[in-house]
């Protein structure tokens, strides 16, 4: 284990995992750097780690630490000057009738079934489409930081919440929101993911938070490069956040 001198965050230690198959770029091996012990990573420390390029998966806080590859670039949307483009405005208008309900992390069978439908449609054969309830819970519903579960439902005929369409897990940081994971009904062309990012930007603006952290942008990965369409954004390159010029 090694300590990072540039992270004055209590007594954290950091270790590198063994190589494992990369989830985003075929035929590549990935490694992660994991922050420990997890019980010291409360919200203030976690906010500092996210600002330095870390992410959270359940109780694990990590960042890419790959040999000879730096394709994963942390990206955050700058909230105050953000303006949606034409396609994003269409997605916002299309789903304007969705009702959002913010909850503490909790297990509901309806959420889990939606998660499985999403994984089977979007990531079939990747392993997560076979996640058990325990695996789902460990991945999304365990946290020591300020986390929320947001469910999005259609408006029912009587004005009450209707059919579940999307669930999003997010963390509330000192300087923004961090999009942990989102899954939704796999309807072709529905643009639920775009709508969700726009919703988080709106929430951050309401809360007076300057950033929405979208995780890692990977230019070569179609699953990840959509994030660059949210402008303006900043990329963390060589240890510094830099405003995108495009």
UniProtKB/Swiss-Prot annotation:
GO terms for cellular component: cytoplasm. InterPro entries: Acyl_CoA_acyltransferase (IPR016181), Asp_Glu_LeuTrfase (IPR017138), N-end_Aminoacyl_Trfase (IPR030700), N-end_Aminoacyl_Trfase_C (IPR007472), N-end_Aminoacyl_Trfase_N (IPR007471). It is found in: Cytoplasm. Pfam families: ATE_C, ATE_N. Its main location: cytoplasm. Keywords: Acyltransferase, Cytoplasm, Transferase. SUPFAM superfamilies: Acyl-CoA N-acyltransferases (Nat) (SSF55729). GO terms for molecular function: arginyl-tRNA--protein transferase activity; leucyl-tRNA--protein transferase activity. One of its GO terms (biological process) is ubiquitin-dependent protein catabolic process via the N-end rule pathway. It is an enzyme of class 2 (transferase). It catalyses: N-terminal L-glutamyl-[protein] + L-leucyl-tRNA(Leu) = N-terminal L-leucyl-L-glutamyl-[protein] + tRNA(Leu) + H(+); N-terminal L-aspartyl-[protein] + L-leucyl-tRNA(Leu) = N-terminal L-leucyl-L-aspartyl-[protein] + tRNA(Leu) + H(+). It comes from the Bacteria. Its EC number is 2.3.2.29. PANTHER family: ARGININE-TRNA-PROTEIN TRANSFERASE 1, ARGINYL-TRNA--PROTEIN TRANSFERASE 1. Belongs to the R-transferase family. Bpt subfamily. Functions in the N-end rule pathway of protein degradation where it conjugates Leu from its aminoacyl-tRNA to the N-termini of proteins containing an N-terminal aspartate or glutamate. This is Aspartate/glutamate leucyltransferase.
């Amino acid at each position: 284990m090694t300590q990072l001198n540039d992270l004055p965050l209590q007594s954290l230690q950091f270790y590198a995992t063994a190589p494992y198959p990369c989830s985003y770029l075929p035929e590549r091996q990935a490694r992660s750097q994991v922050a420990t012990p997890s019980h010291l990573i409360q919200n203030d420390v976690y906010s500092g780690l996210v600002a330095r390029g870390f992410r959270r998966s359940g109780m694990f806080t990590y960042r890419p630490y790959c040999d000879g590859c730096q394709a994963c670039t942390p990206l955050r949307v700058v909230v105050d000057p953000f303006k949606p483009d034409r396609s994003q405005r269409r997605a916002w208008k299309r789903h304007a009738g969705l009702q959002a309900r913010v909850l503490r992390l909790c297990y509901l069978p309806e959420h889990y079934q939606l998660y499985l439908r999403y994984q089977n449609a979007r990531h079939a054969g990747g392993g997560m489409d076979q996640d058990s309830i325990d695996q789902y819970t460990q991945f999304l519903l365990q946290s020591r930081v300020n986390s929320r579960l947001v469910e999005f439902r259609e408006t029912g005929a009587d004005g009450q919440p209707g059919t579940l369409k999307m669930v999003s897990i997010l963390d509330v940081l000192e300087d923004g929101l961090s999009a942990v994971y989102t899954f939704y009904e796999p309807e072709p062309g529905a643009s639920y993911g775009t709508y969700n990012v726009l919703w988080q930007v709106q929430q951050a603006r309401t809360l007076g938070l300057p950033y929405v952290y979208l995780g890692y942008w990977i230019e070569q990965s179609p699953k990840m490069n959509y994030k660059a369409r949210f402008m303006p954004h900043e990329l963390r390159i060589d240890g510094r956040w830099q405003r995108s010029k495009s």
